[in-house]
Amino acid sequence: MMRILLFLATNLAVVLIASITLSLFGFNGFMAANGVDLNLNQLLVFCAVFGFAGSLFSLFISKWMAKMSTGTQIITQPRTRHEQWLLQTVEQLSRDAGIKMPEVGIFPAYEANAFATGWNKNDALVAVSQGLLERFSPDEVKAVLAHEIGHVANGDMVTLALVQGVVNTFVMFFARIIGNFVDKVIFKTENGQGIAYYITTIFAELVLGFLASAIVMWFSRKREFRADDAGARLAGTDAMIGALQRLRSEQGVPVNMPDSLTAFGINAGLKKGLAGLFMSHPPLEQRIEALRRRG
């Protein structure tokens, strides 16, 4: 119930704040003065509905998509002592974090990685790669699992879905304003919407969507520090630092995690310069230093 109320409150807040801001800056009058007959409030509501619908639909099917895209095999009956240990460890960490035990799976990948997903912290999935299980020590694997449980317990999947919904809303909204302005003012289309509207809107959505993704990734990086902190509480600070140091030693290994899951993986590769703005994870050095300061 609280998550539904949060979703509705976020939707309402986005629409109200944007509507008030546009009115204060006289945007409706500016558009009308330039011959653009556009009801901005109705457009904003339309964009909010579809913007949040897209992100929440992705959230609700995230477990299914994760299983399909990574080939994750869910452990229902452990066949080996490693699978038995994995289930017992996740059960213990979940209990300590105060959440229902998530589904546990293994996906076939050489890279050392793991992810958590799911629409609800009591209906989640935590999966680790075969490479991580084979090359990491039990303490390191436990720390990685604790990090992922931290994502689940912190409600990061829902939070990022709401952030993405806000971003989607404004990208759609401003892309359509730009499209209408170009179509009516520059190309002088009088009746309906001309081809310039559709071309400009699509182009604007691509450009604005690319730029707006930096906002989502910035927020994702902040959540990583929180998940590391949760991992340190559940598995121990030294173990969490050790796991990140081990990941740092494997940074040359290609990461093949689907883009839709990288925000909740433990390892998202390495980017430098401006590309770092579009990383879902902070540099490992920063994460290790934050844990050391934690003590």
Curated annotation (Swiss-Prot):
Q: Does the keyword Ion transport apply?
A: no
Q: Could you tell me where this protein is found in the cell?
A: Cell inner membrane
- Entry's transmembrane regions: 4-24, 42-62, 158-178, 199-219
Q: Which cysteines are joined by disulfide bonds?
A: none
Q: Where is the active site?
A: 148
Q: Which cofactor(s) does the record list?
A: Zn(2+)
Provide any one GO MF term from the record. metalloendopeptidase activity
The record describes how the cofactor is bound as: Binds 1 zinc ion per subunit.
> Where along this sequence does the record place binding of Zn(2+)?
147, 151, 224
* NCBIfam families on file: PRK05457.1
Q: What is this protein called?
A: Protease HtpX
Source organism (scientific name): Pseudomonas syringae pv. tomato (strain ATCC BAA-871 / DC3000)
